[in-house]
Each structure stands twice: as C-alpha cells, then as structure tokens.
C-alpha cells in the first residue's frame, strides 16, 4: 500500500502554510502554531489524513474507478499532468471550464469535436483545405486539446477528484459536491475545507510539496489498478482451468 511518512512531508515543506494574516479560521484544528508570521501545519494530522486519502484512491482504482487530477494554477499544472498520465488516469491542468462535470453532455460533444479534428489532422483532410481554413481548424484543435485533452478518453464522469489548491479549484469542488463525487483535496491555511471528503492540510504552493502529493496519488492509483489486474488474471486463469 502507498503511504507517505512524516519525514517525506517535512523534506517537501508540506508543513509551511500561508502568512498568518491570510488564514481561514476553519483550518484552525490543523494548525500547529506560527513562526515568523507564517502558520505551521500540524503534520501529526496531515500524515494519517493523506494516507487515508491514498487508501481510498487505491480502492477506487482497484474497482476500475476513474481518478480525475485537478490543478490549474501554474505551480501545480505540470505535476498534475505528468502524474495523471503516469498512472493512466485523467487531468485538468489548464482551466476549469464551468460545467465540466455538471454539464457533461455538452462537454462530451466538445470531446467528440476534438477527436474529429484529431482524425482530420492525420488523415489528410487538413491538406485539402485552404491555408486559412486549415489554420482555423488547427487553432480550434489546439484550444480544445488544451482544455479537454486530459479528459478526452475518460468516457464518463470520474469516481473521485483529487485537487491541488481548494480555493483555486472551488468550482470543480462544488460541481463534484452537486453530483456526489468524492473530493480529495490539499487545503492550505488560507483555504476552506468545506465540501471536501478527504482533507489533506498542507502547503499547496511549493513545487516539492505538490510533487509529493501528485506522485503519491499516482502510485496509489497504480497500486489499486495492479490489484484489479491481478484479480482479473486470476479470474481468467480460473476460466482457463475449467
């Protein structure tokens, strides 16, 4: 099972919150104290809470569940994309489009358009167009890929969303809440933990912290998927034995 230790978190700077004047009082239970005007997060809480979240994600993946990684602020976007791809899951790393979950029917049409344009770009259709038309379609393709590339193969709503930066991604969290989709989120001292099923109190700005979270979630999803594949192989073997 994937777990993260106190040492891992200390080395990654997970315990450094925001300046005390920007705090959200709802995060008080998770704050150890303050140092040089910066809140220090109590890792005695964060370690077990994150490991519980990892176990949940692993369990979702073990049942062929879909994990959607969400992190659109600059510090998080690259790690979000890399980690989601590494475990063959899904991601939103550019901008959360309103209705991405709650208006899935419309999003699905945009994904279909994206896939059509991808086909046209490789089957020679673009070559038959005027330069201007080809350029317009190329731009449309790039725009759709940027917004929807990480979810184009999701094939339906996710079973859990994993969020870096609860404040920044409040629309995604609200949409998941409306649909009853569980939310795992890293929540810094300036953010609200409301609407989050698995709260991970921690630094949501430092690259090292963000990579620790995203890589751990990817490892948990991989481990869960491995269990699923092992069970499948066992069942397949059982059928062959008959």
From Swiss-Prot:
GO terms for cellular component: cytosolic small ribosomal subunit. The keyword Ribosomal protein applies. Pfam families: Ribosomal_S2. InterPro entries: Ribosomal_uS2 (IPR001865), Ribosomal_uS2_bac/mit/plastid (IPR005706), Ribosomal_uS2_CS (IPR018130), Ribosomal_uS2_flav_dom_sf (IPR023591). GO terms for biological process: translation. GO terms for molecular function: structural constituent of ribosome. It comes from the Bacteria. Keywords: Ribonucleoprotein, Ribosomal protein. Belongs to the universal ribosomal protein uS2 family. This is Small ribosomal subunit protein uS2. It comes from Shewanella sediminis (strain HAW-EB3). The lineage of its organism: Bacteria, Pseudomonadati, Pseudomonadota, Gammaproteobacteria, Alteromonadales.
């Amino acid at each position: 099972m994937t777990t993260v230790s106190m040492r891992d978190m200390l080395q990654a700077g997970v315990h450094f919150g925001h300046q005390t004047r920007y705090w959200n009082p709802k995060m008080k239970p998770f704050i150890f104290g303050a140092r040089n005007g910066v809140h220090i997060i109590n890792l005695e809480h964060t370690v077990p809470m994150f490991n519980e979240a990892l176990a949940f994600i692993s369990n979702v993946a073990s049942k062929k569940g879909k994990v959607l990684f969400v992190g659109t602020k600059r510090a998080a976007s690259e790690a979000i994309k890399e980690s989601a791809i590494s475990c063959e899951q899904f991601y939103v790393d550019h901008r959360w489009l309103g209705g991405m979950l709650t208006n899935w029917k419309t999003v699905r049409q945009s994904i279909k358009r994206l896939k059509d344009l991808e086909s046209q770009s490789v089957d020679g259709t673009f070559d038959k167009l005027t330069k201007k038309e080809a350029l317009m379609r190329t731009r449309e393709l790039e725009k759709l890929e940027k917004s929807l590339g990480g979810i184009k193969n999701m094939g339906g709503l996710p079973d859990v969303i994993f969020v870096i930066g609860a404040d920044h991604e409040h629309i995604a969290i609200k949409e998941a809440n409306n649909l009853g989709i569980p939310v795992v989120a890293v929540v810094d001292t300036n953010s609200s933990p409301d609407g989050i099923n698995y709260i991970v109190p921690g630094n949501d700005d430092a690259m090292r912290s963000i990579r620790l979270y995203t890589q751990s979630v990817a490892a948990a999803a991989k481990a869960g998927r491995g269990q699923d594949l092992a069970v499948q192989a066992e069942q397949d073997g059982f059928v062959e034995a008959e």
